[in-house]
Amino acid sequence: RGCLDRVYEAVNKTCKNIKKNDVVVCIQGDEPMLHPSMISTVIKKLFSEKKAGATILGMQIVNEQQFKNKNILKIVNDSRGEVLYCSRSPIPYLKKFTKKSYAKRIYGIFAFRYYFLKKYFKTAPSILEIIESCDQNRICENNRGMYIAPFRFVESYSVDTYKDLKLVNNKIKKDTWSKKY
């Protein structure tokens, strides 16, 4: 099982008085270069979108290398911002990549209403979730309710390989926010 399941289990072990509309925020550990305003962005979107049970931070992809990287989850949403699909493949299909392309990526910060998280914990993993190794697709395949929380592009790197770790360690040394922690 994936991130949704681990978050639900952790909340139930640590938060004994949680109520159905309480908000749970998940920050994935492979995203060490997050900016504090990213957290408030997913929470604000959750409160502003009446139909949202979850929000996920999304950023424009600005280079073709990220677009083709299977470790970076790409995201497609409808005109209202509701997430339609997440993939490790380059989506949407682009004849030619440009910095102004529609391509977006997931940045590993999510906000959930507790009842929504509980609902998806009780739902079996979906076919597309298993194929893509992306549990957000369980939400997409089961009545949805997850919205993208758009965030302006900031230089960010996920840590999926040793090469990524070396790159991020060098970037963090120069990062103004990391120095404050």
What label would you give each PLM region?
Residues 5-9, 68, 158-165:
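Short secondary-structure transition/capping segments
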Residues 34-126:
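Conserved core of the sugar-phosphate nucleotidyltransferase
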Residues 1-44:
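Short phosphate-binding loop-to-helix
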Residues 19-21, 49-52, 144:
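Short, high-confidence coil segments that cap the C-terminus of an alpha-helix
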Residues 1-5, 62, 154-157:
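A short acidic, often aromatic-flanked loop/helix-cap motif at beta-alpha or helix-coil junctions
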Residues 24-27, 55-57, 120, 147-151:
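Short beta-strands and strand-loop turn motifs
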Residues 101-181:
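Conserved alpha/beta core of the MobA/IspD/sugar-nucleotide pyrophosphorylase nucleotidyltransferase superfamily
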